[in-house]
Design a protein with these regions (language model features):
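Conserved catalytic cores of very large enzyme subunits
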Residues: 1-154, 175-177
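Contiguous, well-ordered alpha-helical segments that form the cores/surfaces of helical PPI scaffolds
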Residues: 158-171
Length: 177
């Protein structure tokens, strides 16, 4: 018969052709801490942009995937930083400057996401009749059309992403993984 390992090998072959791998290992320590056997609501979920939705820092009793989602995301362009601070421009890598600017960008993006979150939270149920009027989000069925969204959006995620890791490494240090 087919084993889990056989399915993993097959999925690797398919991903190699499609170039869009999304693997989620429920038994990894990072995911297993939230998993309750037999409860599909506790299986980790990944959004299309690969945002991981499972842990809930607002309400650990609602560390589930259904009824939650990624509210906003912003991606940091790593190749730009790699070019700016890497050997591609002046044959010298400045890792200290790279990580300093990366830290500054992450703080900037965090602040931007929190500002966007506040804007979203000040909207009302009637602004999103399909998403929130259908009781799709956690606790949204408890709200009236004129209620603000913080009570449901607090369960969502905000994501700082990045693009171009291999290209960044190539321009920063001359090689990638």
């Amino acid at each position: 018969g087919i084993t889990v390992y056989d399915l993993l090998k097959l999925s690797c072959q398919v991903s190699a052709k499609r170039l869009f791998p999304n693997f989620s290992f429920l038994d990894s320590p990072f995911n297993f801490q939230f998993y309750k056997e037999g409860d599909v609501n506790t299986e980790v979920g990944y959004m299309g942009c690969r945002t991981r939705v499972i842990g809930n820092s607002v309400d650990p009793d609602k560390a589930i995937t259904p009824g939650r989602g990624n509210l906003s995301f912003t991606s940091i362009n790593l190749p730009r930083l790699g070019i700016k601070h890497g050997m591609v421009n002046d044959n010298e890598t400045n890792l200290d400057a790279f990580f300093e600017e990366l830290g500054e960008l992450m703080e900037f993006v965090k602040d931007q996401l929190l500002e966007r979150f506040e804007i979203q939270c000040n909207r009302r149920i009637y602004n999103f009749p399909f998403l929130l009027g259908q009781g799709v989000w956690i606790d949204s069925e408890k709200l009236k059309p004129t209620d603000k969204l913080r009570k449901v959006l607090k369960h969502g995620t905000l994501t700082i992403g990045f693009i171009g890791l291999a290209e960044c490494l190539k321009s920063l240090i001359g090689k990638h993984h």
